Amino acid sequence: EYILFDDCYMSTVEVAYDLKNVTNHLIASTCEIMAYGMPYAKIGQYLIGEINYEKICNGFDDFYSNYEMPCGTIAVTDCAELDHLAAIMKDINSQYTFDTTLTGSLQRLDGYSPVIFFDCGDYVSKLCSNQELLAQFNEQLNRTVPFKRNTEYFYSMSRGKVKIETFS
């Protein structure tokens, strides 16, 4: 039914696409996850039996919003939707080339230098100027990632707290 990663940087479109034929859903963080890891005492009941992805995300967010270092992101990816997302991305990529001067304006999701993890929706919003195609992408992204939550900041061991302006 699902794979839950209690690890950093596993909620990326690349990871999801690689595993799309292995599982129905991925539950993971886009960023570094605090040493405490997944708050199983809060979300465990939603992981067993009748899975409730929304409550998993809400429980994670509730826990980390009140944690000593209130930083965290979680997302659920519906792997059945990934081919549709890839088809729209193929269309966008065939029409547009990313202006690398905009790289610094993208929502970073890591502490690396140079940055290697960005918010996918933010990237596409700066790549695609066709509003109709961008709307199609965003609608499909919302179907592909139906549940997600984030605190105001994410934590990076190398940068400390980093503000989250966009989380898709």
Model region roles, listed by residue range:
Residues 1-168:
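Terminal, contiguous helix-loop blocks that mediate binding/assembly
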